[in-house]
């Protein structure tokens, strides 16, 4: 164990540098605003800075921990599950995994509290069942080679059909649920499961189909919440504004964070427990990993736990009040339109601080053998989130319905999926769920809510929906990146001699379907 800890120290330094690159731009933007056009109280500023420090350390531990534990656990479980060649077992275990992981997701409780007309446990169990069912569907898609765009067209058509029967006060929360439930705990594990399942396949489509699990798992909660909204006639959602901190000294400042820590210690322990128990069963029954591998996974789980506790405490106690107050101050100015470019700037950098984004970018680079670099993925995600936050701020200032953005956005994203290489489509729809993580929920959403209060808008219809917008735009930007790459490849092929061109076409993947 000591050797494992020592070996991880150089990696921790590397992860610290990555975390600094992610968090410092956000801190710099907020500080510039605080000292120029958006003055805020010293209490809120100090909470924000201490929260930023905790987020910094949290990202450092989480990214290394997920690399050491969540990814290898998911890959091995996915591989072992597929090796059984037992369809009933894959279905039952897949559903159980999706259900247990989701039911323990901390953000799901927050979502349930926003919809008082539906009993909390009814909503939580329904959303968890939705994720479980769609995780099973994602497994079956990979095993039988079903094209992802077909499923996306089918299910998003059903979603928008159901949306016509749901009260407008409930729409934004329903669409937010898809991004909220694929949090930093579930995403790395679900993505690793996909890589493990695809690893068993020997055909050339395996890499394409190793992504797409998060995409389908994000559909389940939206459908579940929309159906519940119709069944319960859920016409109301609630907005509970964050309590703005007031501290007189450093002891009171630390007291705020110390009171929050036990809550997140408990929440993250509850989230990790189902994953650990399921892995324990796999280890005893089938995996039989050696002690060194188990020790490495155990250290990784400890890092993951510590990192997420620090991250969520810093985000909820430090970032949430600052985001809300900053939104109020900016939208309260005579030049409130400045909220749009500032929101876009914050959106560009804030996605880099999402814990699961690191896992996605690294996995994309590995699975594509460097054809899609982590840096290129990061830029595509940043551009997408920047655009989505800008559009969300337009909604806050104008009160335009979220459907005016979601219907054209998803229609365009699904339309281009028919001509974009399948790998890019799967990655893009996964990226939507990954980008809409806790940083969106604890800073961007409060920013929109604070701005909505300042302009006198309807918070439930105008401010909620930021998560849904952030989940939508990467679908377009990542696929456009794929389309550009494909056009460049075709241009290069045309420039090749005839014999080289023939060889290149011989290497193109066929449409073979895996047999169980």
Tell me what each language-model feature is.
Residues 78-80, 87-158, 336-417:
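Helix-loop-helix junctions within the multi-pass membrane cores of secondary transporters/permeases
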Residues 1-19, 23, 74-87, 202-213, ...:
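Intrinsically disordered, low-complexity non-transmembrane regions of multi-pass membrane transporters
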Residues 243-356:
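Transmembrane helical segments that form the transport core of multi-pass membrane transport proteins
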